[in-house]
Amino acid sequence: MNPSPLLDLIDSPQDLRRLDKKQLPRLAGELRTFLLESVGQTGGHFASNLGAVELTVALHYVYNTPEDKLVWDVGHQSYPHKILTGRKNQMHTMRQYGGLAGFPKRCESEYDAFGVGHSSTSIGAALGMAAADKQLGSDRRSVAIIGDGAMTAGQAFEALNCAGDMDVDLLVVLNDNEMSISPNVGALPKYLASNVVRDMHGLLSTVKAQTGKVLDKIPGAMEFAQKVEHKIKTLAEEAEHAKQSLSLFENFGFRYTGPVDGHNVENLVDVLEDLRGRKGPQLLHVITKKGNGYKLAENDPVKYHAVANLPKESAAQMPSEKEPKPAAKPTYTQVFGKWLCDRAAADSRLVAITPAMREGSGLVEFEQRFPDRYFDVGIAEQHAVTFAGGLACEGMKPVVAIYSTFLQRAYDQLVHDIALQNLPVLFAVDRAGIVGADGPTHAGLYDLSFLRCIPNMIVAAPSDENECRLLLSTCYQADAPAAVRYPRGTGTGVPVSDGMETVEIGKGIIRREGEKTAFIAFGSMVAPALAVAGKLNATVADMRFVKPIDEELIVRLARSHDRIVTLEENAEQGGAGSAVLEVLAKHGICKPVLLLGVADTVTGHGDPKKLLDDLGLSAEAVERRVRAWLSDRDAAN
């Protein structure tokens, strides 16, 4: 028997709109099953997609996509959207090398109105589209779909503030599941959770679930119950508005509707059809459950936010709750998490800050052991950095655990609030370099370039796990702002010290002595440099620091070797290799230099090893490039 007769009919939203509204609940069920199977094979963001199935169906059913624009915030919940927009048969390639991207991507489909991967951009982008349509005299509609976690970021409120004062037709759908990746923090989630109407919504949902089957058997009873439900909701809304005068969003100039059940697809269609005909800024508050329809994800949405894969034989039935085997080698994130706890036990001034990335940044144990010194500020990177600056002013020792790609969002604060005042804040910059399946929006390829130009900054790049701990300890003790950047995943497997040893700031070390060719390597590129150097009898320097850079070592290597190769997992432009060239120019040294890094291009997604090979940064690719360079130079001479 065909498990998805309705879904099989749909290759575009136009096919979806041919269905009767009463068929949509069945379609949503088929879509959820298909989602379980596809993510079960490829891995990816999981719980958030299960919670957005009915909402996605309703939006594409009501809005005339792709002419009408749906702008998904972050993009974690975009898989149902991709399935309904002609990519169903490619879902097995999701986040794989050469396959579908894990986030909306304009070059992938005309239905992906705005490329995304970071949080809280949807309202601003959709507002820009709505303003453009007004200028062009178009009656197209723009819709921003944003979660309550993403709504905590300042950029979302900046866009709300702007939109409420503009005469444009914009719908903001607030998908409220009380989660980002971790449970939400801050005043806004408390406001949403305490809403009287939300409480009434929960009560009505319970009553409907328990009485619906009985009412179905009584002629006319269901229709009467729906009228009563509508009246109760209306009274509750009126009571809430009387209590609060105007809701938060109405004070921003939006007409507020909701909250409504985000898993009742037929009712969602009715509500959206009404909203599509309204003028001006509108906000629809939708209540959903992250992981809906999948008990393990419902019960633990943090664990099932993203999964590597599900057992193939049981994906549709839900996998057994079996803990994965621990990696033989610790990840850099784990090395940081252990160092942080060890350091905090020895220094009561240490405080840790994360912008809503507790699990990913390795802070779970720290929060459990030192809850009073743990600050999750929500999806608010700008605030996280300035907040750290305030702590440092009063004698605390802040450690900001942040991904490289998200540190970009707080660049002004890094310069203005930290570096110009020379405040001793340590940035533990995770996910530096290629990250793999999440693609270019999450790659950490620019931090060396944008950090090393900032006055007072110390920038370190460890080559292995033990060096990571060494450099964290070293930079923590520095009386200046410092960043230690390290990659995703496991290291090289070297033993890791339990101590708090330090090294001299701004000094590198020689890892291998050779002749003629000197490899000047930074961070994760030390390992491939060593692998290649043995075949070419080259010298390898592990620089450790990008700023201050070891000028003495660079000059010595340049004068004792015929040529230099620099290696970094960062953009070539303005990166560590550029720093080496600056040193050579400063000292009037003219030697052939091959600069190996990430060229001026947007990287792809998929297996990191394949991506590094494409970029010419795997050990094999480095050897090919160096040999070709040497051959060209020999031929030229």
UniProtKB/Swiss-Prot annotation:
Query: Its function?
Result: Catalyzes the acyloin condensation reaction between C atoms 2 and 3 of pyruvate and glyceraldehyde 3-phosphate to yield 1-deoxy-D-xylulose-5-phosphate (DXP).
Its EC top class is transferase
Pfam families (alphabetical): DXP_synthase_N (PF13292), Transket_pyr (PF02779), Transketolase_C (PF02780)
- What binding details are noted for the cofactor? Binds 1 Mg(2+) ion per subunit.
Q: In which pathway does it act?
A: Metabolic intermediate biosynthesis; 1-deoxy-D-xylulose 5-phosphate biosynthesis; 1-deoxy-D-xylulose 5-phosphate from D-glyceraldehyde 3-phosphate and pyruvate: step 1/1
List cellular component terms (GO). Answer: cytosol
Q: Which residues bind Mg(2+)?
A: D148, N177
The residues that the entry says bind thiamine diphosphate are H76, G117, H118, S119, G149, A150, N177, Y294, E381
- Upper lineage ranks? Bacteria, Pseudomonadati, Pseudomonadota, Betaproteobacteria, Neisseriales
Q: Which domain of life is it from?
A: Bacteria
Q: Where are the transmembrane segments?
A: none
Reactions catalysed = D-glyceraldehyde 3-phosphate + pyruvate + H(+) = 1-deoxy-D-xylulose 5-phosphate + CO2
* Gene source species: Neisseria meningitidis serogroup A / serotype 4A (strain DSM 15465 / Z2491)
UniProt keyword list: Isoprene biosynthesis, Magnesium, Metal-binding, Thiamine biosynthesis, Thiamine pyrophosphate, Transferase
The protein depicted here goes by the name: 1-deoxy-D-xylulose-5-phosphate synthase
